[in-house]
Amino acid sequence: MKWLLLLGLVALSECIIYKVPLVRKKSLRRNLSEHGLLKDFLKKHNRNPASKYFPQTEAPTLIDEQPLENYLDVEYFGTIGIGTPAQDFTVIFDTGSSNLWVPSVYCSSLACTNHNLFNPQDSSTYQSTSGTLSITYGTGSMTGILGYDTVQVGGISDTNQIFGLSETEPGSFLYYAPFDGILGLAYPSISSSGATPVFDNIWDQGLVSQDLFSVYLSADDQSGSVVIFGGIDSSYYTGSLNWVPVSVEGYWQISVDSITMNGEAIACAEGCQAIVDTGTSLLTGPTSPIANIQSDIGASENSDGEMVVSCSAISSLPDIVFTINGVQYPLPPSAYILQSQGSCTSGFQGMDVPTESGELWILGDVFIRQYFTVFDRANNQVGLAPVA
């Protein structure tokens, strides 16, 4: 009996998963708007989120282009700890990038005065390097140094993790950002500075039993969202997971069969490529078909550059259906029209990302809120199921 109990405990330990709660906060866009800075931000920063996916690197091992407007609408954030003892930071868990960086005490920029700062001298496990990091944000750069330390993620102690410590951060806009830094969860092939991404380091150390992680984004205004490392929790979805092969290993890129409304193709009629990206809030696609979708749902641009929609349209508009690997994934109007403080905006955004296989679509939080998503590195596939 004791042996059976021991075997049961061993089996249970092999299935342990680690959850990082995500909190939903005001986006950077809303913070800037409330402080009367949104128009100035949009004027100074070129609205080109596409450069996130095709960085122009001056030195491939050191520099990455990462336009700040990618994170303008992100609302989901989690807490990690870096160092011994741990220093806490609020980060975006971003499947559309691969690096980890946080502000540091070496940063004198205005943005750093309003965020948590990592102090290497307060960590007994910090190891310095001679490496540097520079990430371009529109009109300025986040520059910093690279170091190694222990990162605490949802109960996991990720030792010897390389990360960036910012020394300068661009403009006054980041002062209002609801996050301190970024934790990238894409493939190592797109990591700047040759840095090993956090999840890869966790897996290489045998800290999780399965080479995958999963994401649930709640529509609730405050809590319930989670990133799960090393496993899948079926309580977050209904039915069974449908698996989609990763078509290009870099971002979490998959093939989409078609996008339809009322049974008619409105985009991607002959198939297209898409990236599943927790670090992009909206659902983006090529400017021409997105313009047609905006017209179909009655969206028009306001003075802040937002595509506004009548809130009453939510009850009458049809679903927009994404067919992926032969399975239909409908988005109801309550998902693709975003309601906030009595006004409504479109969850779609035009963005041209040309590739050899055609223009890319980005399935951001608008899509992920509807579908529990598994990012399976072992089998290079994405799992999707309707949220519970």
From Swiss-Prot:
The enzyme's E.C. designation: 3.4.23.1
Classification via InterPro entries: Aspartic_peptidase_A1, Aspartic_peptidase_AS, Aspartic_peptidase_N, Pepsin_A, PEPTIDASE_A1, Peptidase_aspartic_dom_sf
Subcellular location: Secreted
Active site: 94, 277
GO terms for cellular component: extracellular region
Domain Peptidase A1: 76-385
Keyword vocabulary terms for this entry: Aspartyl protease, Digestion, Disulfide bond, Hydrolase, Phosphoprotein, Protease, Secreted, Signal, Zymogen
Superkingdom of the organism of origin: Eukaryota
Gene3D superfamilies: 6.10.140.60, Acid Proteases
Role of this protein: Shows particularly broad specificity; although bonds involving phenylalanine and leucine are preferred, many others are also cleaved to some extent.
Protein name, per record: Pepsin A
